[in-house]
């Protein structure tokens, strides 16, 4: 993460979203990345920008997880409050955050059901907000962008209840994982295989 360039348009876009949200009374944001070291980088950059941020991944002890969650729920004017929580998939397990109404997916996992699990951290019974905002940060002209544009957007995964799409998403997820895990395929061949799964 220390070797990442300081000129980072992807992070700059996320920072703009975060700054806008911090103007709200409910300023809480959950941000996911598949990679722990990406979160270290984001945490450093956000702290440099003056935000109160913590990270939960598989290496964080349970007592610390519970403490971070309690501080994340505090109102924004509390000096002990956390504004932004950063998670890996493993880090988010077992704790729900219905009081938070914004999630940022800094990157997207290959398996679409993991996206549902991420969303499930905040979109649970007891969510007091009428609208939950989910931002998916996808760099254009990448295989990831093509996967999600073609496979997930077409079935409206972010337009309604994820549960209704579970069967379709599961099959697409299996197809994507098979292609993604086949190390013998070049990017061009992977792209061709992914296009073949369009309906």
Task: Please name every model-derived segment.
Residues 86-100, 120:
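SF2 helicase motor core recognition
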Residues 1-84:
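Conserved Helicase C-terminal RecA-like lobe
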Residues 96-107, 133:
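A short beta-strand element within the Helicase C-terminal
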Residues 90, 196-198:
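Hydrophobic heptad-repeat coiled-coil signature
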Residues 127-195:
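C-terminal accessory region of SF2 helicases/translocases
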Residues 36-38, 60-62, 91-93, 109-111, ...:
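Conserved nucleotide-binding/hydrolysis micro-motifs of P-loop NTPases
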Residues 113-127:
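Conserved SF2 helicase motif VI
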